[in-house]
């Protein structure tokens, strides 16, 4: 198979949703249909046959939430599928936003009883800004929920995107009978008594008159709704879907796996192949460019706690990866050898010899890489556009509970901060270590992982909310620091102030009008 044919097989997408909408469940069902698992909840590596969990971190298992992005791969219907399962909790939005830079499409999962919720709305806005195609799966049809027509209206009114249903529910909750699949000309029957999953339409495009469904009042209602939508609703347009202007909507129940395989088949038919990415000087790097290029969108420590390792996740943008190849690390200008490289099935992994544009690979990292790094070969010498960063608002002082374990404490901080889920600052005057986060859960996960993974108990003292502003090195003066504006350095050694509030920042500006305060550090 040629490089072009291999690249065209790739379908790389993320699943986004509000917590508890069923994101992890649908991920596991997709993996089941892809042959990667034998039952929901257990994920199997392709070569080893060992089973693992897609929510692999202990704290995720205990709380039932995803707080890291898992990358999983399988083959289905002639396509190579890469799924990125993103954190649903809002405190981990930074990790999710970066992950969305590495995909070509998004699947938005919505709880039929709750409709569009806060986190879904936030994530959709990111996807929309990037112009990523969105496919919608309305979940939990086996439970009582909102009217399907109301849910479609909400997509347009709240998210501002036109929608087109690809199938339609026949009843809901305890009356759920199946899906009227007008896209494929059939009815998908929920828990059929005769074991037949599909009722195919006859030559007139209808359910055969002799079939019991024709006398079912829920089916009659579904027919009326569908006819109304087909006449008055939006028409399906592959062009508009790929442009991110129209979302195809599928209904189903991830828990019972109903409607999921039909969704997968249709999604793979219309989801886009790998797309180009822009460099910092606006040059579009096409997937078929023969030179290898990629960017690191995530670094994850301790995917295997036995080895205390760290993996840098790379989205391949162009060309082909070959094991042992030398690449340029653009940030440092140095060459690095990519010899120990893996692909993933949750925390299971296997060595990879080759990968192409659209694939996600994991590079073992001993401290060489940073989130946002660009790797290239040949004539490609520019970095890709920077990944989004979030300025934290909540802060804590942190120290080791046992001073004798300072080494493991420092290693834990270094590795967890490297992942980018929490920010590190050091007081310029006292040397105190301070952590910044978008939300409280990040601190809880940090504390938990320090204990579990690094055997280092920590003392964390809340500092409340702060406003971060960077300054230029030449403006740095220790005398400016006070309890209301703490002078510190970030993990890259850039100077900054942590202001107690807006009033403290205004007071500082009045006193030091020549000092430029920056929301982001700029060289």
UniProtKB/Swiss-Prot annotation:
A molecular function GO annotation: GTPase activity
Highest taxon of source: Bacteria
Keywords from the UniProt entry: Cytoplasm, GTP-binding, Nucleotide-binding, Protein biosynthesis
Binding site for GTP: 17-24, 85-89, 139-142
Compartments, as annotated in UniProt: Cytoplasm
Example GO BP: regulation of translational termination
One Gene Ontology CC term in the entry: cytosol
Span of domain tr-type G: 8-275
Pfam families noted in UniProt: EF-G_D2, GTP_EFTU, RF3_C
Signal peptide (from-to): none
Recorded family membership: Belongs to the TRAFAC class translation factor GTPase superfamily. Classic translation factor GTPase family. PrfC subfamily.
Protein task: Increases the formation of ribosomal termination complexes and stimulates activities of RF-1 and RF-2. It binds guanine nucleotides and has strong preference for UGA stop codons. It may interact directly with the ribosome. The stimulation of RF-1 and RF-2 is significantly reduced by GTP and GDP, but not by GMP.
The protein, known as: Peptide chain release factor 3
This protein's encoding gene: prfC
């Amino acid at each position: 198979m040629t490089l072009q044919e291999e690249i065209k097989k790739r379908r790389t997408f993320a699943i986004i949703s509000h917590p508890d909408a069923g994101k992890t469940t649908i991920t596991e069902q997709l993996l089941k249909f892809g042959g990667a698992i034998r039952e929901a909840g257990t994920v199997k590596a392709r070569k080893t046959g060992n089973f693992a969990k897609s929510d692999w971190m202990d704290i995720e298992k205990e709380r039932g939430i995803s707080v890291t992005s898992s990358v999983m791969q399988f083959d289905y219907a002639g396509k190579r599928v890469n799924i990125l399962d993103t954190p649903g909790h809002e405190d981990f939005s930074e990790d999710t936003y970066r992950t969305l830079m590495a995909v070509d499409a998004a699947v938005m999962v919505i709880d039929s009883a709750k409709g569009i919720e806060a986190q879904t709305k936030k994530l959709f806005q990111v996807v929309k800004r990037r112009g990523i195609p969105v496919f919608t799966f309305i979940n939990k049809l086996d439970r009582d929920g909102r009217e399907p027509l109301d849910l479609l209206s909400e997509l347009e009114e709240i998210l501002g995107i036109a929608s087109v249903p690809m199938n339609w529910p026949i009843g809901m909750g305890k009356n759920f009978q199946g899906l009227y699949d007008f896209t494929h000309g059939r009815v998908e029957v929920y828990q059929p008594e005769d074991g037949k999953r599909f009722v195919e339409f006859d030559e007139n495009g209808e359910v055969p008159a002799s079939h019991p469904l024709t006398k079912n009042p829920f089916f009659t209602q579904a027919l009326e709704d569908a006819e109304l939508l087909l006449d008055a609703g939006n028409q399906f347009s592959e062009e508009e879907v790929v442009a991110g202007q129209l979302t195809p909507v599928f209904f189903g129940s991830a828990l019972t796996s109903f409607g999921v395989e039909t969704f997968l088949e249709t999604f793979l038919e219309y989801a886009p192949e790998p797309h180009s990415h822009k460099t910092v000087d606006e040059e579009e790097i096409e997937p078929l460019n023969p030179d290898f290029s990629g960017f690191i969108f995530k670094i994850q420590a301790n995917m295997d706690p036995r080895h205390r390792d760290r993996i840098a996740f790379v989205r391949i943008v162009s060309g082909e990866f070959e094991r042992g190849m030398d690449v340029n690390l653009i940030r440092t200008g140095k060459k690095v050898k990519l010899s120990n490289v893996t692909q993933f099935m949750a925390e299971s992994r296997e060595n990879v010899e080759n990968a192409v544009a659209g694939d996600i690979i994991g590079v073992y990292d001993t401290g060489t890489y940073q989130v946002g790094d660009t790797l290239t070969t040949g004539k490609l010498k520019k970095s890709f556009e920077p990944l989004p960063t979030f300025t934290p608002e909540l802060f804590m002082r942190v120290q080791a509970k046992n001073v004798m374990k300072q080494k493991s404490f420092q290693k834990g901080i270094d590795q967890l901060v490297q992942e980018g889920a929490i920010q590190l600052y050091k007081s310029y005057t006292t040397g105190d270590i301070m952590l910044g986060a978008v939300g409280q859960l990040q601190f809880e996960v940090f504390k938990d992982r320090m204990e579990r993974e690094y055997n280092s108990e920590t003392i964390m003292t809340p500092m409340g909310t702060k406003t971060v502003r960077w300054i230029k090195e030449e403006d740095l003066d220790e005398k400016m620091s006070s309890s209301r504006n703490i002078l510190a350095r970030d993990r890259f050694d850039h100077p900054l102030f942590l202001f107690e509030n807006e009033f403290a920042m205004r007071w500082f500006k009045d006193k030091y009008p020549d000092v430029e305060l920056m929301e982001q550090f700029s060289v």
